[in-house]
């Protein structure tokens, strides 16, 4: 088992990475929580594979377990689903001394975590991420949110979990497209902070070799995120580097109404697009875009998307959470493994955000 300690003072917690940890989850929770009620929030896809098993495992340790199952997919991460969750929590008579457990991918973790952060002004919660993207990114660091019609993650909070339990065996039932979806974020970590990870990703022969080394990959990504979050928990400076590729990526997701491409696919395109622009401007080392293109192709992610309209992308990007007044903070690469934040005036963003 690999364990990382997120050091955030009173908000510190452990990140556990171990194959088979889901089989021991009730015992693990009992070491962290001595109350009676646990609300398990999951989605209909994950529930089919793991809901009943984990519910029984937790009940075996004497807890009263209540389950909330939401529809899978980004379209569920909205205010209506959130209010439905609030209503169920009220029906269950949940108090601030009870516990929420989120079991699922990024959508479940985000909306379940936001419900925990806001219901009764805060209930403790534990993350059990089941997708690669959630295991290496969204379950760690305390960002919780829901989407609005105008854009992604526009209503949110910073609310740290009591613990994160990561079981790579969940990935065995993950559709190959969603494994590659997670690789969009994995590539991001290598590109911004870890050239050695990027090199290993280039060297893996196929998905089988990737899965043989998945604990290394997960740990490498979580280690980077832990370090960045510890330095900047509230996303005022360094933590913005974790949004490399996301300004364009989120805009593309919104452009297609979250229907055509996954989050990781859009991030991959966003990384390639902004780097092609910054290399053209002489900011990024020559050849970096080609390296990104090759690794994006290797993991079946898009570097070219048809039918995008620049004006709409600029319009959506203006709502990006990295915007500050008339400026937007963009994450750019100097080279693989070396990034920086560039403060760009809104009227100049087209140079960087132009779709390619």
Curated annotation (Swiss-Prot):
GO terms for molecular function: 3-dehydroquinate synthase activity; metal ion binding; nucleotide binding. Its cofactor is NAD(+); Co(2+); Zn(2+). Its EC number is 4.2.3.4. Keywords: Amino-acid biosynthesis, Aromatic amino acid biosynthesis, Cobalt, Cytoplasm, Lyase, Metal-binding, NAD, Nucleotide-binding, Zinc. Its main location: cytoplasm. InterPro entries: Dehydroquinate_synthase, DHQ_synth_AroB, DHQ_synth_fam, DHQS/DOIS_N, DHQS_C. One of its GO terms (cellular component) is cytoplasm. Binds 1 divalent metal cation per subunit. Can use either Co(2+) or Zn(2+). NAD(+) binds at residues 106-110, 130-131, 143, 152, 170-173. It catalyses: 7-phospho-2-dehydro-3-deoxy-D-arabino-heptonate = 3-dehydroquinate + phosphate. GO terms for biological process: amino acid biosynthetic process; aromatic amino acid family biosynthetic process; chorismate biosynthetic process. Zn(2+) binds at residues 185, 246, 263. It holds the Pfam family DHQ_synthase. Disulfide bonds: none annotated. It is an enzyme of class 4 (lyase). It comes from the Bacteria. Belongs to the sugar phosphate cyclases superfamily. Dehydroquinate synthase family. HAMAP family: DHQ_synthase. PANTHER family: 3-DEHYDROQUINATE SYNTHASE (PTHR43622), 3-DEHYDROQUINATE SYNTHASE, CHLOROPLASTIC (PTHR43622:SF7). This is 3-dehydroquinate synthase. It comes from Clostridium acetobutylicum (strain ATCC 824 / DSM 792 / JCM 1419 / IAM 19013 / LMG 5710 / NBRC 13948 / NRRL B-527 / VKM B-1787 / 2291 / W). The lineage of its organism: Bacteria, Bacillati, Bacillota, Clostridia, Eubacteriales. The gene is aroB.
């Amino acid at each position: 088992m690999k364990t990382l300690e997120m050091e955030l003072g009173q908000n510190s917690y452990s990140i556990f990475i171990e194959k088979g940890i889901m089989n021991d989850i009730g015992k693990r929770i009992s070491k962290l929580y001595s109350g009676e009620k646990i609300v398990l929030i999951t989605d209909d896809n994950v529930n089919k594979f793991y809901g009943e098993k984990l519910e029984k495992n937790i009940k075996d340790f004497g807890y009263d377990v209540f389950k909330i199952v939401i529809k899978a997919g980004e379209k569920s991460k909205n205010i209506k689903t959130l209010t439905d969750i609030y209503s169920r929590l009220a029906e269950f008579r949940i108090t601030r001394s009870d516990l929420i457990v989120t079991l699922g991918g990024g959508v479940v973790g985000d909306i379940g975590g936001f419900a925990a952060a806001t219901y009764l002004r805060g209930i403790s919660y534990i993350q059990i991420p089941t997708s690669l993207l959630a295991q290496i990114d969204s379950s760690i660091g305390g960002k919780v949110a829901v989407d609005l019609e105008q854009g992604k993650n526009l209503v949110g909070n910073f609310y740290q979990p009591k613990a994160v339990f990561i079981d790579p065996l969940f990935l065995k039932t993950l559709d190959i497209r969603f494994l590659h979806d997670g690789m969009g974020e994995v590539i991001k970590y290598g590109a911004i902070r870890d050239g050695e990870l990027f090199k290993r990703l280039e060297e893996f022969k196929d998905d089988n070799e990737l899965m043989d080394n998945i604990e290394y990959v997960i740990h490498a990504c979580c280690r980077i995120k832990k370090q960045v979050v510890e330095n900047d928990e509230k996303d005022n400076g360094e933590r913005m580097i974790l949004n490399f590729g996301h300004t364009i990526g989120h805009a593309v997701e919104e452009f297609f109404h979250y229907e055509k491409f996954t989050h990781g696919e859009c991030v991959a395109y966003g990384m390639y697009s902004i780097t092609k622009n910054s290399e053209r401007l002489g900011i990024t080392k020559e050849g970096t875009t080609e390296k990104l293109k090759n690794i994006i192709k290797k993991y079946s992610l898009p570097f070219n998307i048809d039918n995008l309209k620049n004006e709409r992308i600029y319009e959506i990007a203006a709502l990006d959470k990295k915007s500050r007044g008339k400026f937007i903070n963009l994450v750019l690469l100097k080279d693989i493994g070396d990034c920086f934040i560039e403060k760009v005036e809104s009227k100049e963003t087209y140079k960087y955000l132009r779709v390619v």
